[in-house]
Amino acid sequence: MSETHPTAPPATSTRASIFLKLKSTDPTPRELAWRQFYERYAPVVQSYARRKGASDQQAEEVVQNVICGFFEASPRFVYDPARGRFRGYLKTCVGRTMGRMRHESSRSGPIPVDELEVADARADDDELWEQAWRQQILRRAVEITREHYARRGKLQTFLAFEHNVLLGASAPETAQKLGINVASVHTAKLRVTEKLKEVRQILQDEEG
């Protein structure tokens, strides 16, 4: 039987609520929204840039440029789902940012970003973005699932799953480390896996 859905903490704020708070005249919710926006989407941008061949430093620069660009446009930005998914809009922003950085590098040379597209731009570009997006969804799902068990005083259940499934420790090794029996490890694996799938599906439905 599936466990009860967690009460949505700040980490699970919907994209719509984040966009709404970004336009708030109150600095407190606006700053919170920017932090949530950064924590949610910066890893996607960084992962995509790295998959395109950027170094860590280059990828971080792409992130900063994209976030700053969105910040500048936010007062005028109105997201219309009828015009396409936000993930597509964000990918376009990232692509334009990387293109602009390459152009600036070719003119002045201070930023070595000409290697940002080592991978063939015609091959698997959309798939690279999808991989980065799915990675972000899974990361958030893991965080939310961990919070779910922690709030219920069952963090050990999640830790058993984490050691056994995410970190690759055997069931006996996990049991010994956490001071539980092997059967409890297997039970935790089943329950947390089910919960994780549930949370991930919710996030996928929300993000589109």
Where do the PLM segments sit?
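Intrinsic, short, N-terminal disordered tails of RNA polymerase sigma-factor systems
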Residues: 1-208
